[in-house]
């Protein structure tokens, strides 16, 4: 019983430390200008992503969910 209580205390302390310093998790958030294209396409399944963030795309391309997959696409200038 003491081991369970000690484990819960340790987990609580670790979670509090993580919440007290959120800047560590999102240190270098990088987003390219423009908006992701929005097309309503029904996806029966999601394909393996070709990118994870804008930083992984060449030139002015953005990493967006497009045709059931995260991929590098030309961004829109406005959201409309």
UniProtKB/Swiss-Prot annotation:
Boundaries of every WAP domain copy: 29-76
Alphabetical UniProt keywords: Antibiotic, Antimicrobial, Disulfide bond, Secreted, Signal
Protein's gene: Wfdc15b
Official protein name in the record: WAP four-disulfide core domain protein 15B
Organism of derivation: Mus musculus
GO biological process: defense response to bacterium
PANTHER family: WAP FOUR-DISULFIDE CORE DOMAIN PROTEIN 8
Gene Ontology CC: extracellular region
Record localization: Secreted
Keyword Kinase: no
Tissue-wise expression: Constitutively expressed in kidney and epididymis.
Signal peptide: 1-20
Function of the protein: Antibacterial protein which inhibits the growth of E.coli and S.aureus.
Alphabetical list of Pfam families matching this protein: WAP (PF00095)
Disulfide pairings: 36-64, 43-68, 51-63, 57-72
PROSITE patterns (UniProt xref): WAP (PS51390)
SUPFAM superfamilies: Elafin-like
Induction pattern: By intranasal administration of S.pneumoniae.
């Amino acid at each position: 019983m003491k081991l369970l209580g000690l484990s819960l205390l340790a987990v609580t302390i670790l979670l509090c430390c993580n919440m007290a310093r959120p800047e560590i998790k999102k240190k270098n958030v990088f987003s390219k200008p423009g908006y992701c294209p929005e097309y309503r396409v029904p996806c029966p399944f999601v394909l393996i992503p070709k990118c994870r963030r804008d930083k992984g795309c060449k030139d002015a391309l953005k990493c967006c969910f497009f045709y059931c997959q995260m991929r590098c696409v030309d961004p829109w200038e406005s959201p409309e």
